[in-house]
């Protein structure tokens, strides 16, 4: 059996190449059926995301999996081997297993530690299962990759730290308030980043979202996204005493919130803490507001520094994750080696059982018939002898299976017991 993973990713190909090779979800069943129908192909999986397209195959030893993939791509995509060849990576055997485990664990992602790739792998796995393209060893390998990803996330902190500006805002809010349950959010402006930050805050327990914008219709539209309340722009400062978290991202060319206004807001809040997130450029909130007690103001640069710090920490965790992945690859390879000698072990056990059964039959003809109790005792005795005889060579077979120079020892056991290849 051969294992091959061929593909392109954000590391090897620009988006123009990746989009040429991408498979839409509705086209996967037909593509997988075509791939599975190729002579010598045992199993196949196609993973297609924004950042990578990968084809995983197991084939019979007699065929060339690289040629199969090249011909498949030429049938399904309007690309030539010459144009995509420089961007393709190909991993075989152990390297393919290592690559798959790294992809599942998000060590090969554009943002290391992001969880989306594992979900995308599971979708690809389900699609292959549904159309009968997975039914054997590759099926088990894919399942194992999910377990490896789970282990990496549980034993390292690779996915615990915010690495987007919008989520960094949520992380900081938690540090300020502890729990975000029942906190009130106001969005000033209708930018994408403020929408993402508000969405994260809502999912983290924020109870209500006010939205204001110079164009009131846009405030109404965004408020619907969060089951929130649109507020007239002229009234938003009057609403601030009710707000715990303010996200400012309006396109105003000047400050829309000044220190003296904020002083009145904090007094009205009886000095309860307030978190201000200014992700506008130019900034919306006067920086001097940060001098006030119980006010925590962060601008886009502050949030980016949090992200950069977290990315550095993630990369430290990634080193630990790489060690875990290598350990899991070693385990998988050991299992594969043992699986290779399983037919030899079965053949040995069958041969010894045949000898035992034949000798038992001779004893029955010569000294029988036996009582049920005698028969049971003889069966137990002879099976025990056979098991003891088999224990040594079976243990040696399993031991030698995991060694690069184990083939001569395995061949010697075959010869000693007259086992056929």
UniProtKB/Swiss-Prot annotation:
What keywords sit in the KW lines?
A: NADP, Oxidoreductase, Porphyrin biosynthesis
Record has Oxidoreductase as a keyword: yes
Which InterPro entries does the record cross-reference, listed alphabetically? Answer: 4pyrrol_synth_GluRdtase, 4pyrrol_synth_GluRdtase_dimer, 4pyrrol_synth_GluRdtase_N, GluRdtase_CS, GluRdtase_dimer_dom_sf, GluRdtase_N_sf, NAD(P)-bd_dom_sf, Shikm_DH/Glu-tRNA_Rdtase
**Where along this sequence does the record place binding of NADP(+)?**
189-194
Give the disulfide map: none
Give the positions of the site Important for activity: 99
Reactions this protein catalyses: (S)-4-amino-5-oxopentanoate + tRNA(Glu) + NADP(+) = L-glutamyl-tRNA(Glu) + NADPH + H(+)
> Binding positions for substrate?
49-52, 109, 114-116, 120
Pathway(s) where this gene product acts: Porphyrin-containing compound metabolism; protoporphyrin-IX biosynthesis; 5-aminolevulinate from L-glutamyl-tRNA(Glu): step 1/2
Q: Which Pfam families match?
A: GlutR_dimer (PF00745), GlutR_N (PF05201), Shikimate_DH (PF01488)
Active-site residues are 50
**Any one GO molecular function term:** glutamyl-tRNA reductase activity
Q: Which GO terms describe its biological process?
A: protoporphyrinogen IX biosynthetic process from glutamate
Q: Does the keyword Oxidoreductase apply?
A: yes
Q: What is known of its domains?
A: Possesses an unusual extended V-shaped dimeric structure with each monomer consisting of three distinct domains arranged along a curved 'spinal' alpha-helix. The N-terminal catalytic domain specifically recognizes the glutamate moiety of the substrate. The second domain is the NADPH-binding domain, and the third C-terminal domain is responsible for dimerization.
By sequence similarity, the record places it as follows:
Belongs to the glutamyl-tRNA reductase family.
What is its biological role?
Catalyzes the NADPH-dependent reduction of glutamyl-tRNA(Glu) to glutamate 1-semialdehyde (GSA).
- Subunit details: Homodimer.
What NCBIfam families does UniProt report for this protein, alphabetically? Answer: hemA
- Name of this protein: Glutamyl-tRNA reductase
Could you read off the lineage of the organism from its UniProt record?
Bacteria, Pseudomonadati, Acidobacteriota, Terriglobia, Bryobacterales
């Amino acid at each position: 059996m051969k294992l091959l993973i061929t593909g392109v990713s954000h590391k090897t190909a620009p988006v123009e190449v990746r989009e040429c090779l991408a498979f839409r979800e509705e086209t996967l069943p037909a593509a997988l059926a075509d791939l599975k129908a190729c002579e010598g192909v045992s199993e196949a999986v196609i993973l297609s995301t924004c950042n990578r397209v990968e084809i995983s195959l197991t084939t019979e030893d007699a065929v060339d999996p690289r040629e199969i993939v090249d011909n498949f791509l030429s049938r399904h995509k309007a690309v030539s081997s010459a144009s995509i060849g420089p961007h393709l990576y190909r991993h075989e055997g152990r390297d393919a297993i290592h690559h798959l485990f790294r992809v599942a664990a998000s060590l090969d992602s554009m943002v290391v530690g992001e969880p989306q790739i594992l979900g995308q792998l599971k979708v690809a796995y389900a699609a292959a299962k549904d159309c009968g393209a997975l039914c054997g060893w590759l099926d088990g390998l894919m399942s194992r990759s999910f377990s490896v990803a789970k282990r990496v996330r549980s034993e390292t902190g690779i996915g615990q730290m915010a690495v987007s500006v919008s989520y960094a805002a949520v992380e900081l809010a938690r540090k300020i308030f502890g729990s975000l349950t029942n906190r009130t959010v106001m969005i000033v402006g209708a930018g994408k980043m403020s929408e993402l930050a508000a969405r994260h805050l809502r999912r983290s327990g924020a109870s209500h979202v006010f939205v204001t914008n110079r164009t009131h219709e846009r405030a109404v539209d965004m408020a619907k996204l969060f089951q929130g309340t649109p507020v007239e722009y002229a009234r938003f400062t009057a609403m601030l005493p009710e707000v715990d978290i303010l996200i400012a991202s309006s396109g105003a060319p000047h400050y829309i919130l000044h220190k003296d206004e904020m002083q009145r807001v904090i007094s009205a809040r009886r000095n309860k803490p307030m978190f201000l997130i200014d992700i506008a450029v130019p900034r919306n909130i006067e920086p001097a507001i940060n001098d006030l007690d119980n006010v925590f103001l962060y601008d886009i640069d502050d949030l980016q520094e949090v992200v950069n710090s977290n990315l550095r920490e993630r990369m430290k965790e990634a080193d630990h994750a790489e060690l875990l992945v290598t350990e899991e690859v070693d385990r998988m390879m050991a299992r594969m080696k043992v699986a290779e000698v399983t037919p030899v072990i079965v053949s040995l056990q069958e041969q010894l059982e045949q000898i035992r059964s034949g000798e038992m039959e001779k004893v029955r003809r010569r000294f029988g018939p036996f009582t049920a109790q005698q028969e049971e005792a003889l069966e137990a005795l002879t099976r025990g002898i056979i098991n003891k005889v088999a224990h040594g060579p079976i243990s040696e077979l399993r031991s030698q299976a995991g060694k690069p120079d184990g083939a001569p020892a395995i061949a010697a056991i075959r010869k000693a017991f007259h086992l056929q290849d």
